[in-house]
């Protein structure tokens, strides 16, 4: 049995999951190539959590869920796009993914939120100070860093290493070529390669090609997210699927000190899932079910809010501070969120309604815990209370739609093998996981499913490699 190192391209959660599973479970050595100067990709910034259906945490909170219900929610969100068998695998493997993170890396994942498009609360995060993406990525990367020091024959991590070519021979992977920060090229022999190189949300060139209407929108993506993996896989003959399906997240924070910046901090969906509402600056009123799917919330902001900057107001009650203290403290430190009384809100944001009318708007929303919301929101948490006054304190920030996630990419099968245009496995030893792949989310990704996709298909790639090597 060959034990040549598996080359893992990228150190977001998909790459970290694949690498950890390869070395910890199968004792297969890995060489990890990361084009950036640090580990984590976009995964390290994930702020809402990771989905799982039928988990121990859900049982603790008496939440009834099933992989089938999760799959149905995913299919509904996908709007006829994508590959249903990949969606089924995502849902069916979700409790195993949560269990793996808890058991292997001692993560608590003991809190839940219900995000847009989900039938129940299934997005997991841990109590404590760390955001979910940072916590999960840190745990997995720390394990690999330790192994790189203590067992260098098992784990090698190369940063500032951009993959520029893949060599094949007789229908199999044979080598990977990468370029270091000095521009020098190096070749690594490899029988197996796992592409975990992320999406293309930072690439104006690729956005112009696949979704030109989005080129001028700001993005939450890191500057490494330029679609290198998709281009290399396309060159090898991979079937690219749903490349025009690009998720615009409805809420990226507008920095009042740099309003026109093309990069935005994400205003996590959990801010709405745990109680935040959206107000239209033109009317001072709610205008959308904040927990419908991301594409619908985005369309509503773009349709009714100020056209010049697509701006909405994210308003959160004081009760939310208990659940999201660390998030809100960070956002306030960055001047993205303010803590104001309602009197101050009307003045500060020049709302066209009186303070009394704003109080009435928030109190009416709070009453939907006992009656139906005309806008259709069914999860009313951490509302503003039954006695809203001009001195009621809220947390508020300005938000705008942002390019966030590319659903399209190289088509894979349920074994995480890259598929060619003839519907067959493209090359022996070629795998993909995470945002570089396509078909898992269709036209719209559910919040909490990106981290899940990384764990499910990263681990699957490792399992497939191990099975091929038997």
Swiss-Prot record:
Which catalytic reaction applies to this protein?
succinate + NAD(+) = fumarate + NADH + H(+)
As stated in the Swiss-Prot or TrEMBL entry, residues carrying the post-translational modification Phosphoserine are 66
Identify the domain of life: Eukaryota
Briefly state the protein's biological role. Irreversibly catalyzes the reduction of fumarate to succinate. Together with the second isozyme of soluble fumarate reductase (OSM1), essential for anaerobic growth. Involved in maintaining redox balance. Reduction of fumarate is the main source of succinate during fermentation, and under anaerobic conditions, the formation of succinate is strictly required for the reoxidation of FADH(2).
Q: According to the UniProt entry, what is the EC number of this protein?
A: 1.3.1.6
Task: Name any cofactors this protein relies on.
Answer: FAD
**Gene Ontology biological-process annotations:** cellular response to anoxia
Q: How is the cofactor bound?
A: Binds 1 FAD per monomer.
Q: Identify the enzyme class.
A: oxidoreductase
- Is Cytoplasm given among the entry's keywords? yes
Protein name per its UniProtKB record: Fumarate reductase 1
Name the InterPro entries for this protein.
Answer: FAD-dep_OxRdtase_2_FAD-bd, FAD-oxidoreductase_2, FAD/NAD-bd_sf, Flavocytochrome_c, Succ_DH/fumarate_Rdtase_cat_sf
Q: What else is known?
A: Present with 7620 molecules/cell in log phase SD medium.
Annotated active site residues, numbered on this chain, are 249, 272
């Amino acid at each position: 049995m060959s034990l040549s190192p598996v080359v893992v391209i990228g150190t977001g959660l998909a790459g970290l999951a694949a690498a950890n599973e390869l070395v910890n479970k199968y004792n297969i050595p890995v060489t990890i190539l990361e084009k950036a100067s640090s580990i984590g990709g976009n995964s390290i910034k994930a702020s809402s959590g990771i989905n799982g259906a039928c988990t121990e945490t859900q049982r603790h909170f008496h939440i009834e869920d099933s992989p089938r219900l999760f799959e149905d929610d995913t299919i509904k969100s996908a709007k006829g796009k994508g590959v249903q068998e990949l969606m089924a695998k995502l849902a069916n493997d979700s409790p195993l993914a949560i269990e793996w993170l808890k058991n292997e890396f001692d993560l608590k994942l003991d809190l839940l939120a219900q995000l847009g498009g989900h039938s129940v609360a299934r997005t997991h995060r841990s109590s404590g100070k760390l955001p979910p993406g940072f916590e999960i990525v840190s745990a997995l990367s720390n394990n690999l860093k330790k192994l790189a020091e203590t067992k260098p024959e098992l784990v090698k991590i190369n940063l500032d290493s951009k993959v520029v070519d893949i060599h094949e021979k007789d229908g199999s992977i044979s080598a990977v070529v990468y370029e270091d920060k000095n521009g020098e090229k190096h070749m690594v022999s490899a029988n197996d390669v796992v592409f975990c190189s992320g999406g293309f949300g930072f690439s104006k060139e690729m956005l112009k090609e696949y979704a030109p209407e989005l080129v001028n929108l700001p993005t939450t993506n890191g500057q490494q997210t330029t679609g290198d993996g998709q281009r290399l896989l396309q060159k090898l003959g991979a079937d690219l699927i749903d490349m025009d399906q690009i998720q615009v997240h409805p809420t990226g924070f507008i920095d009042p000190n740099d309003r026109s910046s093309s990069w935005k901090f994400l205003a996590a969906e959990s801010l709405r899932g745990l109680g935040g509402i959206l107000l239209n600056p033109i009317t001072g009123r709610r205008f959308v079910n904040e927990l419908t799917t991301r594409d619908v919330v985005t369309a509503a902001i773009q349709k009714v809010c100020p056209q010049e900057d697509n701006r909405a107001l994210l308003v959160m009650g004081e009760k939310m501070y208990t659940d999201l203290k660390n998030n809100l403290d960070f956002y306030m430190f960055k001047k993205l969120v303010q803590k104001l009384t309602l009197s101050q809100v009307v003045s500060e944001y020049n709302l066209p309604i009186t303070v009394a009318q704003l109080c009435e708007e928030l109190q009416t929303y709070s009453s939907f815990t006992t009656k139906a919301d005309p806008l259709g929101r069914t999860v009313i948490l951490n509302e503003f209370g039954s006695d809203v006054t001009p001195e009621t304190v809220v947390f508020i920030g300005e938000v705008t739609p942002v390019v966030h996630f590319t659903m399209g990419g190289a088509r894979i099968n349920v074994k995480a093998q890259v598929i060619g245009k003839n519907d067959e496995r493209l090359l022996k030893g070629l795998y993909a996981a995470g945002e570089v792949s396509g078909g898992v989310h269709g036209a719209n990704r559910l919040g909490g499913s990106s981290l899940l996709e990384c764990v499910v298909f990263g681990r699957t790639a490792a399992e497939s490699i191990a099975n091929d090597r038997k």
